[in-house]
Amino acid sequence: HLSHSNPVQQPQELAQTIVQDFANTLPSIRRLLDGDVRAAYEGDPAAHSVDEVLLCYPGIFAIIYHRIAHQLYAQVPLLSRIISELAHSATGIDIHPGAQIGKGFFIDHGTGVVIGETCVIGERVRIYQAVTLGAKRFETNDDGGLKKDYIRHPIVEDDVVIYAGATILGRITIGRGSIIGGNVWLTHSVAAGSQILQSPNESYQKNHIAG
């Protein structure tokens, strides 16, 4: 029972609960980050050591901050936004703390990457610089103001590779194992195993899974 004679007690207890909850998640965050570092080391032929990946790769810096910010997002959204903006300022990689990102995630190079609030990214996904996972449009309320807290960003399933400069917009699904080529503009879902490639004159889709 909280006493009215001690108005500070309630926020103190809330803060203690948040800190304890966060501390309890640190082992799982560490496991996720181990997988992210391993994905970067194994996914980049220019990486010569795990130490190099940890110390030199902006994508790793950004995902470390994101894993922490995402864990805090539900309870302390302002703090999580501050954390994500520190990473954004340092790396040029803008990941909203609300985005859900699976294990083994690798951002190579990274400058200009944008990942929106309601994105859902599966496991072992690799993306390159200047990729945008954003909203196709912003919905409005009856009074003309922008709606808040609605789903508007892509789902990227497991084992997808998205090359530099690709723009993927709206609540669409990029099927498992797909490859999205550089500079592709995509606003529709694609099946598992698709290759979406951009030629100088046209964009074309190839599905490399039988059936």
Residue map of PLM features:
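Terminal amphipathic alpha-helical/low-complexity segments used for targeting or macromolecular assembly
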Residues: 1-85, 209-211
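Structural signal for interior beta-strand "rungs" in well-ordered beta-sheet cores
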Residues: 88-204, 208
